[in-house]
């Protein structure tokens, strides 16, 4: 996607989709809509390349400004949140914290029982040399999903979502560098998602659900970004599962990937509504059912068959990743959605605090940012905002202007009064 020809195709695609998505493409390449407003840059060579604003910018946003003030108060004094608000905000923040901390060890070889990172870190680090609190594709795509649901008032629009993904990768929308003095490109694009982008562009946006790969294409790229769905649909578990599956199919044809998104949504909706984590996980096998038998087996925490690489017994206190997959790709272990979900459930099952869960999972290395993101979503939805270390949240706030938490708050309240909550987006 980095080649000029690909970028030209994307520019042409944006023009083709103009009427569908109400976008106006200016001659200089900027995108003018009530959703995106490109900030002017002193450097004219980059002013049209990077989207440096969010859907919450600009002054006259009515209740949006009220919500920004509200979220500041809630972050300062979490006890003012309702339990459900706290869990919803906690899940969104958990996604970014797990991602940001996990990036420090991403692509490093898997290790067990070695704890060397106990906080957000200091100085630049990780594959992409990010500052503490800066995030990768996991969170950026999760924010694209959140924005799409907010702007479309809870209706799922796969074309809108894919366009936001393209804007992230090609224009920097929702990346971690909006308040960074350095001009940086978006980072972390996975192989399966990259193929889905290319397919979408080559087809000129005819099919919003990817034709790249096949029904076995089940990386963790759709699971890692799923946080917004259970928050938005916390009162409708059937609808939440449906949207989780659909958002997965935008970039992954894989049956297991879609079913893992359903499973994650099921768990988090239960937690937001007050269920105990241990109870949810202990009853998961009997209460969760889907069309993919391997994911049903994972929910039961069982061995799938005689193949040692299909062991999903995450309740075992000594549970480990597939030994063969870990040997083949020790720096990428966890990138398969089943490995990702199994390890995330294991970590949440054997720990008793948000910080303990995050510290345990990111220190495993491998695909630590994505598995960390999933752990953060679950742990945040259970322990809530008040139990996330404040200093960790402060590190993230340097780069997000409290808008990740704001999205969690607004998604939770989206169906309370759509007109007042999402007016003028």
Which stretches of residues belong to each language-model region?
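Structured, active/binding-site neighborhoods that engage oxygen-rich ligands
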Residues: 2-425
């Amino acid at each position: 996607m980095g080649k000029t020809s690909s970028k030209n195709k994307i520019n042409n695609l944006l023009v083709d989709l103009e009427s569908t998505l109400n976008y106006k493409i200016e001659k200089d390449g900027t995108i003018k809509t009530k959703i995106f407003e490109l900030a002017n840059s002193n450097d004219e060579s980059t002013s049209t390349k990077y989207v440096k604003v969010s859907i919450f910018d600009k002054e006259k946003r009515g209740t949006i400004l009220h919500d920004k003030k509200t979220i500041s108060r809630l972050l300062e004094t979490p006890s003012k949140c309702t339990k459900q608000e706290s869990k919803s905000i906690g899940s969104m923040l958990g996604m970014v914290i797990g991602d940001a901390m996990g990036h420090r060890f991403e692509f490093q070889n898997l290790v067990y029982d070695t704890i060397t990172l106990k906080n957000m870190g200091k100085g630049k680090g990780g594959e992409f040399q990010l500052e503490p609190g800066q995030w990768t594709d996991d969170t950026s795509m999760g924010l694209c999903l959140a924005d799409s649901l907010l702007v479309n008032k809870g209706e799922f629009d796969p074309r809108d979502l894919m366009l936001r993904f393209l804007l992230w990768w090609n224009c920097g929308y929702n990346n971690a560098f909006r308040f960074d003095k350095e001009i940086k490109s978006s980072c972390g694009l996975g192989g399966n998602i990259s193929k889905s982008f290319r397919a979408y562009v080559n087809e000129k946006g005819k099919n919003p659900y990817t034709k790249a790969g096949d029904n076995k294409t089940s990386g963790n790229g759709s699971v890692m970004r799923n946080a917004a769905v259970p928050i938005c649909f916390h009162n409708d578990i059937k609808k939440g599962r449906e949207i989780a599956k659909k958002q997965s199919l935008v970039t992954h044809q894989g049956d297991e990937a879609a079913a893992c998104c359903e499973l994650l949504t099921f768990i988090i909706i239960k937690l937001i509504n007050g269920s105990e984590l241990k109870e949810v996980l202990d009853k998961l096998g009997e209460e969760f059912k889907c069309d993919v038998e391997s994911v049903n087996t994972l929910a039961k925490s069982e061995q799938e068959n005689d193949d040692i690489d299909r062991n999903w017994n995450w309740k075992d206190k000594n549970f480990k990743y597939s030994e063969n997959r870990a040997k083949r790709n020790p720096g990428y272990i966890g990138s398969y959605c089943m490995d990702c979900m199994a390890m995330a459930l294991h970590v949440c099952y054997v720990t008793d605090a948000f910080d303990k869960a995050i510290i345990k999972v990111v220190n495993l290395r491998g695909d630590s940012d994505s598995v960390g993101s999933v752990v953060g979503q679950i742990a945040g939805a259970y322990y809530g905002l008040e139990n996330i270390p404040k200093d960790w949240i402060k590190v993230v706030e340097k780069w997000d202007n409290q808008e990740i938490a704001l999205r969690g708050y607004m998604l939770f309240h989206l169906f309370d009064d759509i007109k007042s909550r999402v007016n003028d987006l």
